[in-house]
Amino acid sequence: MKKSARRQSRELATQGLYQWLLSNAAPGEIDAQLRGALGYDKADKELLDAILHGVIREHATLIEALTPSLDRPVDQLSPVERAVLLIATFELTHHVETPYRVIINEAVELAKTFGGSDGYKYVNGVLDKLAAKLRPAETQARRNG
């Protein structure tokens, strides 16, 4: 199945954030490497830039928003789980035009693609809790169906 430009952007953002979390490389250096990555030409570059640079810029604020929904300290998350959760937290707070279920589903798919065997289940559970806090009206409306 062909990936959407938005999915491709999220995958590249995950790779870039993974690199940043492990090496603390400069955002410009990560940009340069991503431009040479497979699938870059098919990505929504505006979304990729918004996510990658937004998460790096707002890292501390995003961690603060995410932490109450975690069952362990942030530094005990795998780098992939942390990158995926940061992307989803950023999108939940900054891309309100995107339904929260879409954001969670995308994050679960990223965790399946890049993470450990059951990491996606953890990501799903954390984001369900987080979405209820960050988007209470939207999540309540869905639950009331």
Swiss-Prot record:
SUPFAM superfamilies per record: NusB-like (SSF48013)
Keyword annotations of the record: RNA-binding, Transcription, Transcription antitermination, Transcription regulation
Domain of life where this protein originates: Bacteria
Protein name (database record): Transcription antitermination protein NusB
General function of this protein: Involved in transcription antitermination. Required for transcription of ribosomal RNA (rRNA) genes. Binds specifically to the boxA antiterminator sequence of the ribosomal RNA (rrn) operons.
InterPro entries: NusB-like_sf, NusB_fam, NusB_RsmB_TIM44
GO BP terms, alphabetized: DNA-templated transcription termination; transcription antitermination
GO cellular component, one term: cytosol
